[in-house]
Amino acid sequence: MSTIRLIVGLGNPGPEYAATRHNAGAWFTDQAARREHATPRLESKFFGLYARSGELHFVWPQTYMNASGKSVAAVARFYKILPEEILVVHDELDLPPGSARFKKGGGHGGHNGLRDIHSALGTPDYWRLRLGIGHPGDKSQVAHFVLKPPRSEEQTLIDIAIGHALDTLPDVLRGDFPAAMKTLHTAAK
C-alpha cells in the first residue's frame, strides 16, 4: 500500500478561470493544503504553485490544463515520487455535481489535463479524485461549459462533495484507498 506524496490540483491559471468548473481540482487542493498547513508559492522549476508539508507535496500547474503533465512530472522527478504515490484531483463531466469518486489508472476520458499527465508520466497508473461537475448535455458545448462558473446550486453541491473528500484525507495520505472509497462513495450519494 503506497502512501500519497503528491496532490495535484488541476485547473487553469489566472483570476479569470479561478471560479470555473475546470478548476474544481484546484479548489480541493487549496483546502487540503490549508488543512496540512502548507502555503503555496510560485515555483518556476515546477511550472506552477507548489507547497509542502513534511513529505507531502502539493502542486497547482500554472501551464494551462493541456500542459499539466509538465508540472506534475517535474515535481515527481525532483522528489522521486512514483506514479502510484500521486493523487490528481480534477473536474469530471461524467459525474453530477455533488459526486466524488476515487479511481486508480484508466483512460483520460477526453480530459486534456489527464491526457497530458498520462503522456508526461508515461503511465495512467496514478490515483485520481474525480469531482463531479455535470455535463452540458451536448458534446459540442463541453469546452464552453467547463470554462464557466457553476450555477449557485451546483457550486453548493460541488463544495459539499469537496468537504466529503477532504474528510477522507487521513486515509488517503496513509494510502488506505479502500477505507477512503468506502467513506467517500457512501457520503457522496
UniProtKB/Swiss-Prot annotation:
For this protein, the record's InterPro entries field holds: Pept_tRNA_hydro (IPR001328), Pept_tRNA_hydro_CS (IPR018171), Pept_tRNA_hydro_sf (IPR036416)
Q: Which domain of life is it from?
A: Bacteria
Q: E.C. number, please?
A: 3.1.1.29
- For binding tRNA, which residues are annotated in this chain's numbering? Y17, Y64, N66, N112
- Is RNA-binding set as a keyword in this record? yes
Localisation per UniProt entry: Cytoplasm
* Keywords attached to this entry: Cytoplasm, Hydrolase, RNA-binding, tRNA-binding
Q: Which GO-annotated molecular functions does the record name?
A: peptidyl-tRNA hydrolase activity; tRNA binding
Predominant subcellular localization, coarse grouping: cytoplasm
Q: Which SUPFAM superfamilies match?
A: Peptidyl-tRNA hydrolase-like (SSF53178)
CDD domains associated with the record:
PTH
Q: Which GO terms describe its cellular component?
A: cytoplasm
Where are the residues marked Discriminates between blocked and unblocked aminoacyl-tRNA as a site? N12
Group of enzyme by EC:
hydrolase
Catalyzed reaction equations? an N-acyl-L-alpha-aminoacyl-tRNA + H2O = an N-acyl-L-amino acid + a tRNA + H(+)
Q: Where is the active site?
A: H22
Query: GO BP, one example?
Result: protein quality control for misfolded or incompletely synthesized proteins
Site feature location: Stabilizes the basic form of H active site to accept a proton: D91
Q: What does this protein do?
A: Hydrolyzes ribosome-free peptidyl-tRNAs (with 1 or more amino acids incorporated), which drop off the ribosome during protein synthesis, or as a result of ribosome stalling. Catalyzes the release of premature peptidyl moieties from peptidyl-tRNA molecules trapped in stalled 50S ribosomal subunits, and thus maintains levels of free tRNAs and 50S ribosomes.
Cite the NCBIfam families for this sequence: pth
Family to which this protein belongs: Belongs to the PTH family.
HAMAP family recorded for this chain? Pept_tRNA_hydro_bact (MF_00083)
According to the record's subunit comment, the protein's assembly and interactions are:
Monomer.
Task: Spell out the protein name for this chain.
Answer: Peptidyl-tRNA hydrolase
Q: Which gene encodes it?
A: pth
